[in-house]
Curated annotation (Swiss-Prot):
Belongs to the triosephosphate isomerase family. It is an enzyme of class 5 (isomerase). The gene is tpiA. This is Triosephosphate isomerase. Substrate binds at residues 9-11, 173, 213, 234-235. InterPro entries: Aldolase_TIM, TIM_sf, TrioseP_Isoase_bac/euk, Triosephosphate_isomerase, Triosephosphate_isomerase_AS. PANTHER family: TRIOSEPHOSPHATE ISOMERASE (PTHR21139:SF42). Keywords: Cytoplasm, Gluconeogenesis, Glycolysis, Isomerase, Phosphoprotein.
Length: 253
């Protein structure tokens, strides 16, 4: 039985005060960590403070991206060593916005996954197709290619502790979402790729999230599906009430 994981991706939202207020509002109301992992991936500027504010709760704090080098002349970047030094638990890697706006490649994402693992940070590896690819019927081919590239060079026991997030690009922030059956089909295909690369036990252990306009009114159906183990959530993670609703749905899935 895979434990669900709900990860909020705040992107470039919230002031410092708003971020602290959010954590204060949710940290005493979280479902048991035995039932669901609760994660907030906040802007990098806030990470050290949020880790401290949430330290007495079961809320895990994550980053939204990172470099793969530990140090160097990379202006504006944040290293895995720096994230680890402030006790960040998770990091989102390969989000479609990073791929599109910052030209992140599959090769770079693979290096970032390795760097995260080396510092005991759980990578949330994103994959997903464009609307054009979906209409062309190449969704599973595209996603399989991204996953194979991201997982290249790793051992099964490493992959078991990763999180994979399927986010169809056309559904991110658009209000559109894949049907629960469609999302489950692609998440199942991802699990099959993991089995092909490693083995059935690894495929059964790895957690696969769905992301793309996940909201309190559709999360129950999504989480009822066999291959969907949680959600990577944007807008619905910005308000304490909706975030807690998502967590409760996952805890009772």
């Amino acid at each position: 039985m895979r434990k669900p994981i709900i990860a909020g991706n705040w992107k470039m939202f919230k002031t410092f005060e708003e971020a602290i207020q959010f954590v204060d509002a949710v940290q005493d109301k979280l479902p048991s960590n035995e039932k669901v992992d609760a994660v907030i991936c906040a802007p990098a500027l806030y990470l050290p403070t949020l880790v401290q504010v949430a330290s007495e709760s079961e809320l895990a704090i994550g980053a939204q991206t990172m470099h793969y080098e530990n140090e160097g002349a990379f202006t504006g970047e944040i290293s895995p060593a720096q994230l680890a030094s402030v006790d960040v638990d998770y990091v989102i890697l390969g989000h479609s916005e990073r791929r599109e706006y910052y030209n992140e490649t599959d090769e770079a994402i693979n290096k970032k996954v390795a760097a995260a693992l080396a510092h005991n940070i759980v990578p949330i590896i994103c994959c997903g197709e464009t609307l054009e690819e979906r209409e062309a019927g190449t969704t599973e081919q595209k996603v399989a290619g991204q996953i194979k590239a991201a997982l290249a060079g790793f051992e099964a026991q490493q992959v078991e502790h990763m999180v994979i997030a399927y986010e169809p690009i056309w559904a991110i922030g658009t209000g559109k979402t894949a049907t629960a059956d469609d999302a489950n089909q692609v998440c199942g295909a991802i699990r099959s790729v993991v089995e092909e690369l490693f083995d059935a036990a690894t495929a059964n252990a790895v957690r696969i999230q769905y992301g793309g306009s996940v909201k309190p009114d559709n999360v129950h159906e999504l989480l009822s599906k066999e291959h969907i183990d949680g959600a990577l959530v944007g807008g619905a993670s910005l308000q304490p009430e909706s975030y807690l609703t998502l967590l409760e749905a996952a805890a009772n899935a």
